[in-house]
C-alpha cells in the first residue's frame, strides 16, 4: 500500500508502542489543566518506532484540542538555534519571519504561547550543532512538555548542567 511507504505516514495504531505512548501522554496530561507538563528523553535503536509513536501522540493531541500546540522538529534537518526557532514559528503559523533575529522570533513564540501550551518534540537531538534554543524553551516557556528523541542514551550525559537540571 503506497501511503504506508511515505516517510510521514502515521498508522492508525502503532503496534508494540502502546506503553511508550501512554508514558508520553502522561507527560502531556498536566497541560490539559493549564499546568506545565513533564519532559521526557526517548532513546533506542534506529527503526524501532520512536518517531512514529511520538508523531501518533502529537496527531491525537492535535485532533483533541487547540489549546495545546504540538511541535515536531527533526534536528537532522534543522540543527541550529535560528533554524529551530524559525521552524517553530512556521509550525505555529507565525508570519513574516524572514530577516528577523532569533531573539525577536523567540519573543513572538513566548507571546503566542502565553495563553496556550505546547509539546515540543525534538527528534535526532544528537545531530544538533547548538543547544541554546533548548535552554531558552526550558527556561522561558511556561506551560510545555519537551521530548527529546535520540538513538544514543549516552547523549544526555553530554548535556550542559544548566540544561540537564531543567529536564
Predicted features by range, described:
Residues 16-20, 49-50, 80-81:
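Phosphate/oxyanion-binding active-site loops and adjacent basic polyanion-contact surfaces
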Residues 12-16, 73-76, 97:
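Pocket-edge positions in alpha/beta enzyme catalytic cores
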Residues 1-36:
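A short, basic N-terminal segment
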Residues 30, 63, 94:
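Conserved helix-loop functional segments at active or binding sites
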Residues 39-41, 63-77:
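Conserved catalytic segments around the Walker B and adjacent sensor/switch elements
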Amino acid at each position: 500500500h503506497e501511503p504506508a511507504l511515505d516517510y510521514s505516514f502515521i498508522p492508525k495504531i502503532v503496534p508494540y508502542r502502546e506503553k511508550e505512548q501512554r508514558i508520553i501522554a502522561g507527560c502531556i496530561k498536566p497541560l490539559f489543566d493549564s499546568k506545565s507538563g513533564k519532559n521526557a528523553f526517548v532513546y533506542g535503536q534506529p527503526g524501532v518506532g520512536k518517531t512514529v509513536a511520538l508523531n501518533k501522540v502529537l496527531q491525537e493531541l492535535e485532533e483533541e484540542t487547540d489549546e495545546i500546540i504540538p511541535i515536531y522538529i527533526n534536528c537532522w534537518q534543522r540543527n541550529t538555534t535560528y533554524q529551530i526557532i524559525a521552524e517553530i514559528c512556521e509550525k505555529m503559523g507565525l508570519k513574516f519571519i524572514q530577516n528577523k533575529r532569533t531573539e525577536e522570533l523567540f519573543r513572538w513564540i513566548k507571546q503566542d504561547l502565553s495563553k496556550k501550551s505546547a509539546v515540543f518534540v525534538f527528534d535526532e537531538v544528537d545531530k544538533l550543532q547548538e543547544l541554546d534554543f533548548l535552554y531558552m524553551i526550558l527556561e522561558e516557556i511556561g506551560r510545555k512538555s519537551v521530548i527529546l528523541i535520540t538513538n544514543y542514551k549516552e547523549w544526555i550525559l553530554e548535556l550542559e548542567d544548566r540544561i540537564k537540571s531543567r529536564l
